[in-house]
Every structure is written in structure tokens, then in C-alpha cells.
Design a protein with these regions (language model features):
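Glycine/serine-rich phosphate-binding loop and adjoining beta1-alpha1 elements at the start
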Residues: 1-40, 74-79, 84-204
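Ligand-binding pocket scaffold of soluble enzyme catalytic domains
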Residues: 4-9, 15, 28, 36, ...
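Adenosine-phosphate binding glycine-rich loop
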Residues: 9-26, 40-44, 52, 165-203, ...
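Rossmann-fold NAD(P) dinucleotide-binding segment
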Residues: 29-32, 63, 114, 128-129, ...
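Glycine-rich phosphate/diphosphate-binding loop of Rossmann-like nucleotide-binding domains
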Residues: 49-67, 176, 180, 184-259, ...
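A short helix->loop->beta-strand "cap" motif at the edges of active sites that frequently abuts
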Residues: 66-68, 92, 138-139, 163-165, ...
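ADP-ribose/adenylate-binding Rossmann-like module
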Residues: 73, 120-122, 136-150, 268, ...
């Protein structure tokens, strides 16, 4: 039994899912193969992910492989109710409604775990966390993690000998983090900022906090829209890289003083805190494109504000001392709450990794330790080659002579 908003939205969801499928041909090829082989036949798969049209295509691929699939949302504001309705109609157990309370959010997580999944999929390690605390009663073969934030949490668990089953860090596959994180986050985060605020980005001072793959993407897209980009980054190598890309590189305090828009992409807590609010300009807009809603210290902001008013869909105005600070999407993921998330074409590769990881866990879990794993390189290369061809690219083929030269040590300067 699913928990959704309105089953009558299914026809709308079907159109949205089918539109995304047009741009997800790598995943579609896997789905056709899975339909023939049924590699996940009889397995229960529990997923905690953003309930979007792209995710729907992954869920339908797993179902085509023979799995019984249950899905809940990884973010209360990212659920597309029409997509949830269509998936429920298609035989996927769905527990997701846009805008649910925290209590309902965790009820939905538990509903997925009540299906006794053999394999779980996470977008932030919420299911895995429950499987190591309140729901340690549920045995699983293994799990998968989609995000940088989730992988950090899992590697910490492994380091402290707390992880009790193998997990595939899908985020660490090149065909995920080099494309989804950079190009997907960059485009969708700036799309969310523009949709929420209707700002002209050209000429604004846009501060990007964090210069990992996601931060690089946001900085590139903001710069491409005409912004004056400043990067905040604690890692000296990344900071130097940002500088050589042509961006200003400043401390968070000095960057906060000049910002018109700040996008936090750190995966860490309180990247924007009271000391930053104190020096910000009147009318600054704050957005989170990292993961959890802790990057902006909203408790401190609210505590020291005389009023909080919703002035526009996805925009809250905090009256902080004698100025206004605008928070987008309640400090949650701006690209999913205020826009439609990553383009389907880039999620195609990420979800191809997820689908293949499910089969890999099923085939190998008996020989795996409770550690964080990365999919084999050949999986990455196969996904990349397929996507390259679909986008009209051509792969260079080395000659036998060139391959032999690269494998030898005898040849040098003659």
C-alpha cells in the first residue's frame, strides 16, 4: 500500500516520466537487458531518493529486472506528487508526499524498511543510518549511496568499524561525480536560484561556498551567466584551482560582505552562520545546493531576526537587525525545491550506475566485507562509451604499436 497525495495525478506523472526517459537511453538499454535476464528476480529493493521523473525511470528499470521495489523521498520538498502517483499505479510501493513533516518523513523511511529490503539505495544515507540504529533488525545484502555527503558519512562509519554490510559508493564512479555533480548541480542550482528569485544574475556578486565537483559546476554556470564569482574553499589546492579559473578567492567572512547571492555547496554544517549574517548586505539571497538543510544556520538566523515572512514561493525574508536576508527553499536543496532538479540526460549515467550496482551487489555480496566499495572501472568505461556514442561523439582507437609503447619501459629519447 502506497502513501501518496493523489492517485488522480498519475496521468500527469506518466507524461513527465516518459519525457525524461527520452533522454535516458543508457538506462533504457539496461532496462531492456534486465527485462530479458531478470537479474534481480524476487529481490526486495528499498530506495530513499528524490521522487522525480528521473528517479522513476530507475525504479521502473529495477522492477523490469524482477525486483519488488519500495521508494520513499530523501527530501520533504523534492517529491513530485504526480510522479509518485504514476509509480504507485505502475506497481512500485511509494511513500512520498511533497511537503511532509519531519515525523511523516521518518514514517515513510520506516515504511520502506518494513518491506525487508535485500538491497537499499540511499541519497544521503538515511536508510543506512536507520539500519544501524532503530532498524538494525532488518538484514540486508548491501546498499548504495548516491551523494558525496552520504559517502562521507559511510566512510566515517567504516573507519570506526560501525558499518555492518557492504555499500557501493555510486557517487565515486567517474560517470557519476564528474558529470552529475558538476554539470547537473551547476545547471540545476542556478536554475533554482533564478526561478525562486527572478534575479538577473549578470553583474551580481555570486559567492560559491565549496569548490568540489558541485561547487565547480555552480561557479561555472554563474560565471557563464555574467556573474562576478567569488569562491570560498578551505582546501588550498582547490582554492588555487579556483583562482586560476579566474574567480576571486576569499574567506567566508570577506566573501559574505560583498555577496548578492550565496550558494553553499559544502556538505557541511553551518557554512553560513551568525558571523556571516552580521556582515551581509541588505537583500542578499542565500541558497543551499549541498545536501542537508544544515549548511545555513537557520536557527541562529531566526533567533536573531525580528520577523520572518514568506515574500514569494520558495523565498523567506528574515528581518535581521536593520537589513533583509532572503533564504531560498527553506534552506533545503534549491535545485529540487525551487526547480526540477538535474537534467535527465546527466541522471542517465548516475542511475545506470545505480542499476548495475544493484546487480553487482547481488552477485558479489557473499564475498564482500562491511566496507565502502566503488564499482569496477570497466562499468564506468562502458557507461561513458555508450553515452558518448548517443551524444554523437567518437572514441579514438589506439593502434597496437601505441598500446605496446604505453605498456613498455624500454623506449625513451632516441
Amino acid at each position: 500500500m502506497s502513501t501518496i497525495k493523489d492517485s488522480n495525478l498519475a496521468s500527469i506523472g506518466k507524461d513527465e516520466v516518459n519525457w525524461a526517459q527520452r533522454q535516458m537511453q543508457v538506462l533504457e538499454d539496461i532496462k531492456l537487458d534486465f527485462e530479458k535476464r531478470k537479474p534481480l528476480d524476487g529481490l526486495n529493493i528499498g530506495a530513499c531518493m528524490h521522487v522525480t521523473k528521473e528517479t522513476a525511470n530507475l525504479m521502473l528499470t529495477l522492477k523490469a529486472a524482477g525486483a519488488n521495489v519500495a521508494l520513499c523521498a530523501s527530501n520533504p520538498l523534492s517529491t513530485k506528487d504526480s510522479v509518485a502517483a504514476y509509480l504507485a499505479e505502475s506497481g512500485i510501493q511509494v511513500h512520498a508526499i511533497h511537503g511532509v513533516s519531519n515525523e511523516e518523513f521518518f514514517e515513510h523511511l520506516n515504511s520502506v524498511l518494513d518491506t525487508k529490503p535485500d538491497i537499499t539505495m540511499d541519497d544521503g544515507a538515511d536508510l543506512v543510518s536507520l539500519l544501524h540504529t532503530d532498524r538494525a533488525d532488518v538484514p540486508v545484502m548491501g546498499s548504495m549511496e548516491e551523494t558525496t555527503t552520504g559517502v562521507i558519512r559511510l566512510k566515517s562509519m567504516e573507519k570506526n568499524n560501525k558499518l555492518r554490510f557492504p555499500v557501493v559508493a555510486v557517487n565515486d564512479s567517474d560517470t557519476k561525480h564528474l558529470f552529475d555533480n558538476r554539470f547537473g548541480t551547476g545547471q540545476s542550482a542556478m536554475d533554482g536560484v533564478v526561478r525562486a528569485t527572478d534575479l538577473l544574475i549578470a553583474g551580481l556578486n555570486v559567492v560559491v561556498v565549496g569548490f568540489g565537483d558541485c561547487g565547480k559546476g555552480v561557479a561555472e554556470r554563474a560565471y557563464g551567466m555574467g556573474a562576478k564569482v567569488t569562491v570560498v574553499e578551505p582546501n588550498s589546492v582547490r582554492a588555487l584551482e579556483a583562482l586560476m579559473h579566474g574567480y576571486e578567492v576569499k574567506s567566508s567572512i570577506n566573501a559574505a560582505k560583498i555577496a548578492d547571492v550565496i550558494v553553499s555547496v559544502t556538505g557541511n554544517m553551518h557554512a553560513l552562520d551568525k558571523q556571516h549574517f552580521d556582515v551581509m548586505k541588505d537583500g542578499v539571497a542565500l541558497a543551499n545546493a549541498g545536501h542537508f538543510d544544515v549548511e545555513i544556520n537557520l536557527e541562529a538566523l531566526k533567533e536573531h531576526s525580528s520577523s520572518v515572512d514568506r515574500v514569494r514561493d520558495h523565498v523567506e525574508s528574515y528581518k535581521y537587525n536593520d537589513k533583509e536576508i532572503l533564504v531560498l527553499a527553506e534552506g533545503r536543496l534549491v535545485n529540487l525545491a525551487a526547480a526540477t532538479g538535474h537534467p535527465a540526460s546527466v541522471m542517465d549515467m548516475s542511475f545506470a550506475n545505480q542499476a548495475l550496482a544493484a546487480e553487482w551487489i547481488k552477485d558479489n555480496y557473499k564475498n564482500l566485507e562491511p566496507k565502502v566499495y566503488t564499482l569496477p572501472t570497466e562499468v564506468d568505461l562502458k557507461i561513458a562509451a555508450t553515452k558518448l556514442g548517443l551524444m554523437g561523439g567518437e572514441l579514438e582507437i589506439l593502434t597496437e604499436e601505441q598500446i605496446k609503447y604505453l605498456d613498455s619501459w624500454e623506449h625513451g629519447t632516441s
